[in-house]
Structure formats: C-alpha cells, structure tokens
Amino acid sequence: ILILIIVCNYFSLQILNYKKYNIKAGNNSLRKIILKAPRGIIYDRNEIPIVDNKLIYNINIIPKDFNSNTFNYNLIDRTININKKTIDSIVYSNNTSVKQFRPYLIKSNIDFMKKSILEESKLDIKGLYFTNSPIRTYTSSCNLAHVLGYLRDLDQIEGYSGIEKHYEEVLKGSDGLEYHLVDRFGIDQGLFIDDNIKRPEQGKSVYLSIDSGLQSYSEEIMGENIGSIIVMDPKTGEVLTMLSTPSYELNSFAGEIPIKTWNKLIKNKDKPFNNRAIQSSYPPGSIFKLILASIVLDKKIISKDWKINCNGKYEFYDKVFHCWKEDGHGIVNLNNAIKGSCNIYFYNLIQKIDFDLWSDEVLNFGFGNILGV
C-alpha cells in the first residue's frame, strides 16, 4: 500500500501537475486576473443604442511585488499624476499576510500613450500591472441621465439609479477568469493556458419605449429652463420622452468622478439629481381641463359646440375667480376653450357634473395611483 501511495504521488507530481510545479521551479508564479464582464446594451424604441461599453486601461499594484527602494515614483507622478504618498498609502495599508497578494487599483481610464510609456519601464515600476475593463459610453445625442441612471463602484460595479438600477440583474454580465505567468520581477509573461480559463459573458440588452429623437427635440424646446417634459403614447401609455432639467452629464459618471464635479452637483440649489418628472409633486392644473372635457363628452353632458362668454372672471358665491387672460376670451366653444386653456369655460363646465361622478372618473384616469415608473 505504501508503495502504491508513493507511485500515485509521483504520478501526480510528474504527469498531472507537472506544468504547475515546473512554473514554480523556474521562479515564476501565477497571477489571477478577473475579466470584468461588459453590461448589456440599452436601446431606444427604434433599436438605436443609447448606452454601450468601451474598454479602458487600469493600473493596479500588488503590495507583495512592490519594492519602495527601486520603485520609480517620479515616473508615475509625471505620467499619471499619482504621488508617492498615495502609492505608499495603498501598499502599506494592505501589506498584511493575505492582502499583500491582492491587486489594488491605482488609477483607472488611462489612455494608450501613458500606458505605453509605463510599460516601457516595467523594471522601474515593479508591482504595477495593467488590466482592461469595460465602462459605459453614451452614444446618443440626447441626455437621458435621469432615465438611464448611473453606476457606482462599491464592491463591484452596479446600477445605482434609473434603468441601470431597476434592470441590474438583466444588464449585469458574468465576470471571467484567467491566469497569467509572472516572473520573479513581477512582470507579466503572458497567459497561462489551462482548464480554469472562463471568458466573461456580457449582460443582456434592454429596450426602452423612449424615442431618442423626440427626447432630443424636447431638450431643444426646454433649453435652459427648469422643469420637466413627459410625452406618452395615449393608446398604449408608453413613455416616449421623459426630460428633467437641470440635469447632469452621464459621461462624468462613466469612470472616476472628480470631487469638484460631484460637489458642484450636490450643492447645486436647483438639484440636478432630482427627477422632476416623477419625483416631485405638483398641482395638476390645466391637465384637469382635458379630463373634464373627456368626461362630459363621453357622458354626453354637452356637445363640443356648447359655448360660454368668457369676460375674464367667474363669480362663485362670494368668491371671484379669474381667467389667465385678464380681458377674457370672448365667446368660446369646447375646442376653443381647450386651445386657449380658458379657465372661465371650465369653471362653468364643472358645475354641470355630479361631484361623485367627477371623483370616480378622475380615479379611472389613474390620478392618485402609483405608476410603477
């Protein structure tokens, strides 16, 4: 039995695990690389992509491979504007027996030129290595910040608001895994091919009811004003446009958000993070004129030709209510009253229906209900 055990171990060392132990014998080691999965693409109703992904370069550091005596701090400071204090803080705060083998992000979204400069001096920056990762890119000319939402990097990238948050489980992909050979200087020697390689799987796509062309037109109309615009398909209830202003630039949230940019947004008295289309309460105002018109026509209480004389004011007991047009609209029928938003016409019209009927019909139109948007 003893001989059999020895033979089995010998077979394992020399045949089954030869590749792994041969790496270690040659002063090489394996580095585990997590391959971040791209999120699903978000399309508008016409299958135009409005959120996609692009690859960026990130630079990481492994404390175990770092040597402060030979590390070229000046090169890093000149190239990517990361000083010695920042690097040492990351290294020495994670230099425990377990943490020292893990990679820690130094800087993300490095351009190819800077990456090339640093890679030419690998021996002077031992402990640093590059990875690729996907970030969001916004391909549409329209600004859908409040609808789409943005991502946050907590333990992992995930949707923090809007569509990105609501459809997190659909949009997020499945990360991949591979191992790289690393020599005794900590320099990457290429991919180690074995059965543990797992390719990242992209998240599933999401298709919105939003019309990006109509959204852009709404932004043009709104200009610099503060407010919101919602356009819906009256037959299906689909939201074609949802605009809230002021807004914010989503590309600022694709990578690291500069502190100045973040502080400026959260301190803005006009609250650009507030989605005025669905997160604020407003008196319904003239929208009730359309509801009232629909009810009286449906119940055949009046015809569209029913007329009144608008002289600019309406007396109700001891109260006087005014039209927005001080000198009045004159003789108006239903069509003209809607076109001119005549207050006096609808003050008269509301007197023709029962209060209980009004209450029931308004609820039937969905007022007071949670929309699920």
What is each model feature region?
Residues 1-20:
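Hydrophobic alpha-helical transmembrane signal-anchor segments
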